[in-house]
Each structure stands twice: as structure tokens, then as C-alpha cells.
Amino acid sequence: YNESLGDIKRMQVAVSQCHFLQLIIKVSDSKKILEVGTFTGLSALSMSLALPDDGSLITLDKNSKTNKIATDFFKKAKQEKKIKTIIKPAMESIEILKKENNYFDIVFIDADKDNYKNYYDSSLEMIKKNGLLIIDNVLWHGEVADKENNEKFTKIIRDFNSYVKDDKRTKQIILPLGDGLTICSKL
């Protein structure tokens, strides 16, 4: 299927990241996950497969076309009972989830980079103590290391990485899997 995506297939998480997410879910005994950014559902499906039978995953995305692709994959893998999709801008969905007093063991962020800081701060409020916030694309093809590179998204990710590094609410590490994952543990 990925070959049919053309240039946008680069938005897909790497297989190594899927394996890592599954490992983290299993060793942490996580049961409730929020994903910000569904795309075609690879990461959501990978995480759902690692959840126990009573686990659940909510995934947020505003794109109904890619959401249809994702939900078709969820059904084929018999995971549709564990996965709930919400189709609207992620910040709107996050605010609703907060008002409903939802809490999560893990939040995985892989969505529009302009809102990474907003997603991070809002999601952190819904993570249980010692819960994990995992963010994708933090190495941004290695471009964040080039201080001379001031391309819009490179700068956004570089500034986001600095913000997270200085955040006293979490303990964090960057792993060079795929396009880079930041793993934050809520203190």
C-alpha cells in the first residue's frame, strides 16, 4: 500500500518506530492511548495490536480521506473495537477530551508541526504521573542540527525540542529511530 502513496509516504512512521511503540506499551502495561495525527493508521494499528484486550486507543485527525483508509485497515486487522477515531482539528478534540476528564498512559504526537507545542502542553495535562508522551519527527531529517537552516518547519521543530528539553514537568530523551522520537516521562 505504501508505494501507492507517492511522496506523502514519508509521513508514515518507520517500522522501527512501530516496533518500539509496541515494546513500550507492553513493558509499561499501558491500557489507554491517545494518538494525535492518524494519517493512514499505521502507528495506531501497531499500538492497538500491543494493547491488552481491554485496552483502548483514541486517534485524532482532521482528514476524512486518510481516516477512511485507516479505519479500513483497523477493520481488516480486527482492531476496530479498540480504536476510536475522531475527525476534526486535533486541538478541538483534545479540549473535548480534557473536559471529559480523559487520562492516558501514553500520548503519541505525529501531526502538524505548527501545533506541536500546543499538543504537548495540552496532552501533558491528560497524562497520568509517570505516563509517556512520545513525539515523532524531532530530528526533522537531521536538519535541526544545522543552526544555519532557518526553514520554517526546521525552526519550529528546533524550537520545540528546546522547549521540551527545558521543561521541568518531564524527563526526556531523544531516540534516533525513524525521523527521531522524543520520549517524555511525566514527573
Where does each model-flagged region fall?
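A short alpha-helical cap/connector motif
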Residues: 1-108, 113-134, 138-187
